[in-house]
């Protein structure tokens, strides 16, 4: 038993070190969302007070998180966690980040720590969510993101944060759009939303792997409709910017276009930016030819557009 414990601990440490190797900026804190595991109905407790909610149910995955050579984290179950990054001088904004990965892993480097690197240099605090993989339990990723909001709202004043938005990429964009439309109260409602090449619909135009991994290979008509998030946009959906490429061969651009049309019908302010090229998965890298960076000379435009939009949201503070 003791040997098994040591082997398990070493595996977890190795996975953690692998993730750290891909981080451009070290988080100020890393917190497990369910410190006592998924089998206990508790989230994060501080000074005897429950700050977040319990896990709903276990997702059935066991063992340590896995990390591949690109820094993508998989097999996330008991070890779901959040990385918190607080800039030296916070400008009042914070973003909860949902990396993509088709609901089978989290792109923790290109769509996580690289986001934190860019944001903290602008004075924006960041919470990267390494959420549980559904594994047949479709409610769990959203519970994890909502718990991240609960934790960040609780500590916002001490961090100098007045506004908390959400950002997501690909399947993480589906999760961020879920957070933007399926929130349960003011605490879990994002103040703004950034969706980057997001999966939106689970109808014909969907990304097949994302849909199967969240709601299964033979989903009910109810689940398909419910998780097609163009159907969930309302007047209470936060203002949103969508950014993607016209030649995205993985996630049809109509996903974003249909979400934007739903926003227009409901009177939700927002912007839609479609770059000429770039494909899918270009993330937040600032290193030329790193990862799947296909934006080329449009990369500077992407950062300028997003930076301006975020600055404009901050003017309301």
How does the language model describe each region?
Residues 236, 241-244, 248:
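Short beta-strand/loop motif that positions the catalytic acidic residue
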Residues 107-115, 128-163, 294-299:
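Catalytic nucleophile-loop/oxyanion-hole region of alpha/beta-hydrolase
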Residues 22-90:
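N-terminal cap/lid segment of alpha/beta-hydrolase-fold proteins
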Residues 257-317:
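C-terminal catalytic histidine-bearing segment of alpha/beta-hydrolase fold enzymes
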Residues 60-66, 198-232:
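Mobile cap/lid helix-loop segments that gate and shape the active-site cleft of serine hydrolases
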Residues 249-258:
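Conserved alpha/beta-hydrolase "acid-adjacent" motif
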Residues 92-100:
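Short beta-strand element of the alpha/beta-hydrolase
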Residues 147-210, 224:
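Primarily recognizes the serine-hydrolase "nucleophile elbow" in alpha/beta-hydrolase
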């Amino acid at each position: 038993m003791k040997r098994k414990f040591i082997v398990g601990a070493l595996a977890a440490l190795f996975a953690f070190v692998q993730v750290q190797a891909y981080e451009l900026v070290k988080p100020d804190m890393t917190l497990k969302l369910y410190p006592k595991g998924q089998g206990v109905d508790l989230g994060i407790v501080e000074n005897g007070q429950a700050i977040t909610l319990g896990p709903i149910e276990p997702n059935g995955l066991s063992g340590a998180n896995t990390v591949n050579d690109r820094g993508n984290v998989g097999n996330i179950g008991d070890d779901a966690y959040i990385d918190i990054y607080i800039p030296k001088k916070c400008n009042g904004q914070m973003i909860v980040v949902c990396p993509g990965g088709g609901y089978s892993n989290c792109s923790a480097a290109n769509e996580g720590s690289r986001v934190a690197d860019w944001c903290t240099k602008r004075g924006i605090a960041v919470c990267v969510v390494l959420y549980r993989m559904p594994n047949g339990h479709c409610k769990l990723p959203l519970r994890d993101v909502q718990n991240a909001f609960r934790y960040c709202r609780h500590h916002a004043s001490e961090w100098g944060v007045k506004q908390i938005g959400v950002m997501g990429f690909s399947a993480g964009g589906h999760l961020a759009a879920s957070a933007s439309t399926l929130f349960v109260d003011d605490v879990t409602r994002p103040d703004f939303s950034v969706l980057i090449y997001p999966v939106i619909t689970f109808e014909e135009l969907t990304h097949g792997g994302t849909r199967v991994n969240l709601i299964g290979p033979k989903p009910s008509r109810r689940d398909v409709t419910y998780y097609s998030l163009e159907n969930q946009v309302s007047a209470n959906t936060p203002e949103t910017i969508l950014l993607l490429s016209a030649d995205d061969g993985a996630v049809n651009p109509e996903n974003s276009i249909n979400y934007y049309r739903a926003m227009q019908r409901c009177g939700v302010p927002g912007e839609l930016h479609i770059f000429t090229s770039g494909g899918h998965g270009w993330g937040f890298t600032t290193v030329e030819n790193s990862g799947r960076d296909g934006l080329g000379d449009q990369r500077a435009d992407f950062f300028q557009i997003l930076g301006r939009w975020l600055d404009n949201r901050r003017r309301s503070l």
